[in-house]
């Protein structure tokens, strides 16, 4: 497994950070795998204890920063990968692993078509947490998958802060790579249509980091 590339670190904890509409349960297979091999693991519930009507991306960054020490490794997917980048900028950790990460504002990503964004304007304007429709998720984020699998994934998704959704999807988050002192490692998925390999590669290049692609 490519994850053995990080095993040479002597760590106190492996912290796993979920994506935008995800939850800690998406990491169950990973935490079980690494726990069986002697690692202490925690899948962070970003939303726990926070008011989704008020929370912003920086609140998630502060939450993760408050949990980790400089001996720990952060592993994040999608938005969680962007949180890894931001935490590494603001504090000291052993290393970070970013899986199909959302990009900071200097690396343009594919956006949701404007006409599919209109229905979510009231949520954005009034700070109402929401979960995108199955149609949007199916067509934009899970295209190419069979519908049974699309439904299974969609049913696991959770509501997210409209503020955080706006900040991530509209790429309002900046990261100063010169402030990052730990190694970062990036993983992209060959078939990913939301965050294509070329985007993951550009993010890795921003930090002069290693990059791998998986099927």
Predicted regions mapped to residue ranges:
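Conserved alpha/beta-hydrolase "acid-adjacent" motif
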Residues: 193-199
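Flexible "cap/lid" loop of the alpha/beta hydrolase fold
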Residues: 92-127, 164-172
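Short beta-strand/loop motif that positions the catalytic acidic residue
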Residues: 180, 186-188
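Active-site loop/oxyanion-hole signature of alpha/beta-hydrolase fold enzymes
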Residues: 47-72
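Gly/Ala-rich beta-loop-alpha elbow adjacent to hydrolase catalytic centers
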Residues: 75-80, 84
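Short, surface-exposed "cap/lid" segments of acyl-processing enzymes
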Residues: 14-49
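Catalytic histidine neighborhood in serine/cysteine hydrolases
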Residues: 201-215
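Active-site glycine-rich loops that stabilize anionic/oxyanionic intermediates
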Residues: 19-23, 78, 190
């Amino acid at each position: 497994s490519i994850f053995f590339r990080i095993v040479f670190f002597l760590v106190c904890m492996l912290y796993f950070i979920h994506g935008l509409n995800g939850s800690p349960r998406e990491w169950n297979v990973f935490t079980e795998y690494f726990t069986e091999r002697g690692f202490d693991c925690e899948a962070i519930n970003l939303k726990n204890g926070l008011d989704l009507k008020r929370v912003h991306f920086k609140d998630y960054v502060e939450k993760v920063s408050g949990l980790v020490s400089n001996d720990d490794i952060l592993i994040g997917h999608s938005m969680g990968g962007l949180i890894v980048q931001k935490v590494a900028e603001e504090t000291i950790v052993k290393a970070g692993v970013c899986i199909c990460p959302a990009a900071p504002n200097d690396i343009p990503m594919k956006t949701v078509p404007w006409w599919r964004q209109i229905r979510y304007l009231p949520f954005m304007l009034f700070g109402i947490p929401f979960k995108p429709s199955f149609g949007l998720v199916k067509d934009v984020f899970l295209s190419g998958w069979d519908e049974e699998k699309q439904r299974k994934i969609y049913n696991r998704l959770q509501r997210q802060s409209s503020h955080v959704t706006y900040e991530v999807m509209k790429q309002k988050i900046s990261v100063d790579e010169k402030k990052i002192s730990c190694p970062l490692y990036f993983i992209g998925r060959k078939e990913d249509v939301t965050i294509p390999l070329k985007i993951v590669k550009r993010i890795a290049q921003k930090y002069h980091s290693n990059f791998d692609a998986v099927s």
